[in-house]
């Protein structure tokens, strides 16, 4: 059972304020053309707007509950025919097709807690790409003031939805707990520096095309967020 199953109905209200990445990923998909693969597709926060642009999305997620919500949302949006939703994970995505774009939005690679699993996941993403195809994803590494302001405290993220961040700066992990009327869960994320992500991408056989500081592709000059575009060499 995925940690997200118990908050599948809560997920959209919990993440409703996260919108800054949607247009970026939609544009990347339009540039690549159908089909695209979205890893950790969740409830379709990005996949459904992508499909609304006429792009076929192969969406992979390890949570049956999240996929169920995604299917229902896609039906309401009138794009269910463009979404091919499959149960699977980052390490072995069940995709036989080879595509020009694989995405892994909303920091989902941070669920991988060691370099072995990170390399496995990056290698799996690479195997889905045609030569010249691109992997696009975003991650973060927390700033000291964020850790200080949030550590060990229940904070109301959205009305009636609370989250608690427990940071371990030695292990570089975040244990995040979420609770609301629709459910509760706890999961662990692990962060790396940009230099470490670059090294892993290169070790996995990618050529890094860009490391940006935000979804408008501003140059990375320090800060918490990094947005990566990497290519499978031809």
List the predicted regions and their residue ranges.
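Conserved class I S-adenosyl-L-methionine
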Residues: 1-34
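Class I SAM-dependent methyltransferase "Motif I" SAM/SAH-binding loop
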Residues: 40-44
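A short acidic, Gly/Pro-enriched loop at the edge of an enzyme's catalytic core
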Residues: 94-101
